[in-house]
Amino acid sequence: MSISNMTSTVWPDLQVPAVEYNHLPILTVALLTVIASAVYINVSSAQDPYKVSSIPTVKRPRVLDAYRSGVWWRIFVPRLVPYIEEGYHKYNKNDQPFRIWLGGFQTYAYVLPERYLEKIKNMPESEASFAAMANKYFHTGLPTGEVNNLVLQVASKLVNGNLATIKTLMQGEVQKALAREIGSPRQWTKINAWQVARKTTEAPGLRVVFGEELANDKTFVTGVSEFVSNITVYAFTLRYINLGPLRDFILYLVHWRHRRSLPAVLTPLNNVITERKKVRSNRHISDDEESFDCIQWALDQPVSDDCKTAEAIARRLVVISLGTIDTVAGVLVKQLTHLASHPECHEAIRAEIRECLAEDDKGWTLKSSARMKKLESFIQESLRMSSGAISLSGMRIVTGPGFRLDDNTILPRDSFIAIPTRNILYDPEVFPEPEKFDPFRFYKIKEDEKNAGPLSNRRDIRASWLAFGYGRQACPGRFYAINAMKAILGEILLKYDIRLAEKQAPSIDIDLDPMLAPARSTDLEFRVRA
């Protein structure tokens, strides 16, 4: 029985109209659905016009990392090094980039294969910038002021250009610092490695940056030491928590207490800068009267007037002091630990130092230091094993329209790019037996290359020694840092015997994403040589 007949039987007076099927509404809904889907797909694809989503992601599971490492707090700060290693072998070794989340910077880093080193080597800041990366992710503007051309000019051109004279000053300051911190103990005496590294880098760093007057002002020295020591601590406070759009505001509040300690540094520094400006405006200053320090070099720079106010210069010099003191100390403490762990190389390095100093009756000069190839090899090997202060190098922010990869994928503006330094330095195809500390590895490689002649097809190892970055935007203070390390390690070897305080080799660094922070609890033992 049809529905119409059933209805008329139950309700005889009800008239049921004949049903005519109209397919137009159904077709309209279907068409609108297709259009909406097309629009959605188009919008979705428009959000990735550069094909960035095609780059694989290496994940860092927090709970699993805490379990693997056996450290509970890794739930909040998972390690970075093991996962970069995973991406390096899975993707970079197959000539592919990958991306990985940097908790300390709250952004993805696009980690590029080694062959991109040549592409970024000579890139100008208008295309990819290290300074922009430092200002954005280290928030240098919060405690002091952003890295600008004045900082780069003073650090790269003037400090490096005056290294011959700086070297003499540096050696004298190091000798005085060692006399204060270690003295002349006849018996083995235990001293904290970080304390030795900090004080021996602080002495020459203060003298070169702030001049003799302020370097001998105990109140000023204490203020600078405390402020610089806290820069890294405050820099990573709350950085591992996703604060969303409130991030910059909250970090500004976090740095408030840190900024309160800045006047203790800026006030006396401002006074010195103002006085020098006043003297120069009243009379001609001869070359012999010119002060030899970064204050003077900053005053002499051809930069705009707003960058040369006493306040502006003072703030930028504090940024430079971070590099000459705290950063160098963080690397040096690892080298002291390596030195104490490998007594078998001490006599060979000592003999070379004595020989080089004897050839130059002027003592520790830039020329004599440059001939200390075994000491330099030790420093390079220590940097290779510890990767310096960070596990990535070549860090830049893309400042141009985009960074084109070979497969036509383009990393858009503001992308964070980097090279996997630590993994390249631990690659057995680059350095055989990478887990072994060989203090004369680089010395032997250079001797082999020298004997092979200019037609050798050997791999350029300089492209694999990346602790100071690479190319035109590498660390501007690297030459100062290397000479400071030579001065300190050389003086220690000549004057002291050194060994580990504990029989078991201590840890060298701590993986704190993206930093490789030095272990500050390591104790060493020193004894003056007969």
Swiss-Prot record:
GO biological-process terms attached to the record: secondary metabolic process; terpenoid biosynthetic process
Cellular localization per UniProt: Membrane
Molecular functions (GO terms): heme binding; iron ion binding; monooxygenase activity; oxidoreductase activity, acting on paired donors, with incorporation or reduction of molecular oxygen
Homology family: Belongs to the cytochrome P450 family.
Domain of life: Eukaryota
Pfam families assigned to the protein according to its UniProt record, in alphabetical order: p450
Role description: Cytochrome P450 monooxygenase; part of the gene cluster that mediates the biosynthesis of aspterpenacids. Performs the C22-oxidative modification of the terpene synthase sttA product preaspterpenacid I to produce preaspterpenacid II. It has still to be determined how preaspterpenacid II is further modified to produce aspterpenacids.
CDD domains to which the protein is assigned, alphabetical: CYP503A1-like
EC top class, as a word: oxidoreductase
Membrane topology note: Single-pass membrane protein
Residues that hold heme according to the record: C475
KO phenotype (gene knockout): Abolishes the production of the ophiobolin family sesterterpenoid.
Protein name as annotated: Cytochrome P450 monooxygenase sttB
UniProt catalytic activity: preaspterpenacid acid I + reduced [NADPH--hemoprotein reductase] + O2 = preaspterpenacid acid II + oxidized [NADPH--hemoprotein reductase] + H2O + H(+)
Gene: sttB
Cofactor needs: heme
